[in-house]
Amino acid sequence: MKSVNIFTDGSCLGNPGPGGIGVVLRYNQHQKKVSQGYFQTTNNRMELRAVIEGLSMLKEACNVTLYSDSQYMKNGITKWIFKWKKSNWKTANGKAVKNKDLWLLLDEKIQIHYIEWKWVKGHSGHYENEICDELAKLGANNPTLEDVGYQPA
């Protein structure tokens, strides 16, 4: 099984507002970068979409080390999602889970991979996180996509 590193970040100019994702995928000496922009979205949706896009780039089951500065994404996929599924997608206080569409998609994407989730402190000089941040901001400043599933509060 191939071992890959995926670095992700999301950005939003206003929250809600235009948003973007940045992804760096590394396999051996190969590297691929992705920047995408969305017209109207939130920061959390961009963090989730960045991870989904990174995993979507993989053509086969892989050992993945995934780096993100989003505690929301990391806690959601490694802890909270199990309770959400059991409670029919309700939070502990009985409210509907936000971004359910993306959580379902992310949950689907992780099933064939072995993933080690790594949190990195944002804006702390972590090289790949800074690249992803730049790619995400580039996308947010040049949106071309609709964030299908986004629902204004």
Curated annotation (Swiss-Prot):
Q: Which GO terms describe its biological process?
A: DNA replication, removal of RNA primer
Instruction: Give the source's domain of life in one word.
Output: Bacteria
Check the record and name the CDD domains matching this protein. RNase_HI_prokaryote_like
Subunit description? Monomer.
Q: Which GO terms describe its molecular function?
A: magnesium ion binding; nucleic acid binding; RNA-DNA hybrid ribonuclease activity
Q: How is the cofactor bound?
A: Binds 1 Mg(2+) ion per subunit. May bind a second metal ion at a regulatory site, or after substrate binding.
Annotated organism of origin:
Haemophilus ducreyi (strain 35000HP / ATCC 700724)
Cofactor(s) named in the record? Mg(2+)
Q: Taking every annotated instance into account, which residue ranges of this chain make up the domain RNase H type-1?
A: 1-141
In short, the EC number is 3.1.26.4
UniProt key word Lipoprotein: no
Identify the HAMAP family for this entry.
Answer: RNase_H
**Protein name per UniProt:** Ribonuclease HI
